Amino acid sequence: MRECLEADEMIELNRFLFEQTFHKLRASNSLDKVLVVSQDDQALDFARLNGGIALQENAESSLNAAVAQALQFIMTTGPGRVLILPADLPYMTAEDLEALLTRETAERAMVIVPDTRQLGTNAILLSNANMLKPQFGRRSFQKHIRQATSSGAELIVWLNENIQQDLDTPQDFSFYNKIILQPTHIMKE
């Protein structure tokens, strides 16, 4: 993405995507709470001001460490389902989110939504916070599948084109820019 955008544009895009995703999560009737873990004070303030829970990410943390920190925090607040979702899912709708939240069935279940290339992981729904050791990054989809099957959890791989489309590559951004940021207006003659 750094090939497509200047640093300040990246910050602006990330903030827009975060706020868009946050509002979709808060609007869901199927979620009790929205937890944001971040090192960004503005993101944490936004979460607090909009009814979310803000958790200061440990210094110099990786994505996996931040997710593990969030899962640990959730385990201290009591049992329950957990949805792990990045902010770079601009095509996800409220309907997609609700459909995902109805997928879990077993007492120990893991629902995984891969990216379009089925290499990365774009969403994970867990029946318990203690079921996952986060392994985001290269080939995370396969790693999370292995983790689910080796733990004896019911594994559900759910393919949803809107949740699968993220903004990880310059090609992803180019498509997003054409479709969302610069829509074409078609007029009937």
For each feature predicted by the language model, list its residue ranges.
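Acidic donor-binding segment of Leloir-type glycosyltransferases
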Residues: 29-54
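Conserved donor-nucleotide/metal-binding helix-loop-beta segment in metal-dependent transferases, i.e.
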Residues: 92-118
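Conserved alpha/beta core of the MobA/IspD/sugar-nucleotide pyrophosphorylase nucleotidyltransferase superfamily
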Residues: 139, 146-189
